């Protein structure tokens, strides 16, 4: 009996996980012992190379989010060690964005020539080296250099992971980018919470960040061998200037990240000034925004498959505009918190969908196209706070934020052409 059962299971054990478009199909084994066949299928699927590679790609997004989330709790400590005024701190924080923007075009070219794995490892190494320095340095010039290099590392790994995610999405023939970016959001939230918990328990900033760096480095070294060793394009392909479509998508990403930056930098100030919400709890608006953004990304692939990219972009843009109107114009706190929740939900799938859009165009290499839209998008986070502050000085904060929300009309009006063109 054992020999017979074993012989019937051999085809299942030998079968490749994704052969003939099916997972572990063996009718005879299933009829002979369905329970054992199920156990073998589960065990093999966990060990299957495709399963491991998929989770390795997902880990890259998680680690990138963890890196960014680890820096946020360090900001007030860096300010106090260096004795910085608010204006000096603002200039210091700009170094992160400039480092990212300068590194992204180079990362796009390196991804094409050296591969996603190479760029991910370089970016991860820079991140792991700079985070401990950001937790200990007290000189403004040294902090500026370290933060710029940290931004360069994060910008590089951002380009590589999006190119890699694009290739995986192409290979599987179904939407996957939103889920990948959901893990980025989850990594940022979990890392910030872990750092906050360690600091609350009395750990020094260096010890707290060392724990996070150890996690990042350990996971990076474990899954690096499973990352894609090449880029999405032919390394011998000539350099191509950004096409009109790529530039327009970049501008739309600029608007999306400007909106995200507005919620990050101005939501607490607005709630405190206009609704008299205490600053100690006004930051809850951004927490609600972040949670709904993560939830929207985890459901985004499912929605995109059923609704299509065009409807997802149109619906997302409308949700953001309605959310801004609720958050800014309505007085009861449940309603304006619901507004911030709608903003996060509407904005959640914008960047992942645009990554897929530029990956499908043929006017320039996908790696460079993603670097272009990411670089232009980062300008929204860099310039956004200053632009909103200037507009608030001229017309008022309420009106300035309403104008930011209205900018999402550009996404609604161009969605069909961008997603289909």
Task: Label every model-predicted segment.
Residues 117-120, 313:
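Primarily marks hydrophobic transmembrane alpha-helices of the MFS/SLC 12-helix fold
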Residues 103-115, 296-308, 392:
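Helix-to-loop junctions at the C-terminal end of transmembrane segments
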Residues 78-79, 110-111, 197-202, 271-272, ...:
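Interfacial helix-cap and linker-helix signal at transmembrane-aqueous boundaries
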Residues 73-86, 265-280:
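Short amphipathic helix-loop junctions that connect adjacent transmembrane helices
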């Amino acid at each position: 009996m054992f020999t017979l059962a074993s012989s019937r299971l051999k085809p299942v054990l030998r079968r490749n996980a994704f052969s003939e478009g099916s997972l572990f199909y063996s009718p005879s084994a299933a009829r002979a012992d369905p329970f054992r066949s199920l156990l073998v299928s589960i065990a093999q699927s966990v060990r299957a190379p495709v399963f491991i590679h998929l989770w390795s790609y997902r880990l890259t997004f998680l680690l990138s989010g963890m890196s960014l989330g680890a820096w946020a709790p360090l900001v007030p400590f860096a300010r106090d060690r260096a004795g910085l005024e608010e204006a000096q701190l603002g200039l210091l924080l700009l170094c992160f964005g400039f480092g990212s923007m300068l590194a992204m075009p180079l990362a796009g070219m390196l991804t094409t020539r050296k591969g996603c794995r190479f760029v991910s490892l370089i970016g991860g190494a820079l991140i792991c080296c700079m985070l401990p320095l950001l937790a200990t340095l007290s000189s403004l010039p040294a902090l500026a250099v370290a933060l710029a290099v940290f931004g360069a590392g994060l910008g590089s790994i951002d380009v590589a992971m999006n190119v890699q995610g694009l290739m995986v999405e192409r290979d599987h023939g179904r939407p996957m980018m939103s889920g990948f970016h959901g893990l980025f959001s989850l990594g940022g939230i979990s890392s910030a919470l872990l750092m906050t918990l360690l600091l609350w328990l009395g750990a020094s900033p260096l010890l707290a960040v060392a724990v996070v760096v150890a996690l990042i480095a350990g996971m990076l070294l474990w899954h690096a061998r499973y990352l894609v060793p090449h880029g999405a394009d032919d390394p011998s392909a000539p350099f191509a200037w950004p096409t009109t479509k790529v530039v327009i998508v970049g501008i739309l990403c600029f608007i999306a990240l400007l909106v995200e930056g507005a919620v990050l930098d101005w939501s607490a100030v607005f709630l405190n000034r206009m609704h008299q919400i205490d600053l100690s709890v006004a930051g809850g608006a951004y927490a609600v925004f972040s949670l709904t953004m993560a939830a929207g990304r985890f459901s985004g692939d499912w929605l995109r498959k059923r609704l299509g990219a065009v409807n997802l972009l149109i619906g997302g843009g409308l949700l953001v505009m309605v959310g801004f109107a609720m958050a800014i114009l309505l007085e009861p706190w449940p309603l304006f918190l619901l507004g911030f929740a709608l903003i996060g939900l509407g904005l959640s799938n914008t960047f992942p969908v645009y990554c897929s859009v530029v990956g499908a165009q043929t006017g320039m290499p996908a790696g460079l196209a993603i670097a272009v839209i990411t670089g232009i998008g980062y300008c929204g986070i860099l310039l956004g706070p200053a632009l909103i502050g200037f507009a608030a000085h001229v017309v008022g904060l309420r009106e300035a934020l309403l104008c930011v929300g209205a900018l999402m009309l550009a996404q609604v009006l161009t969605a069909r052409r961008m997603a289909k063109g």
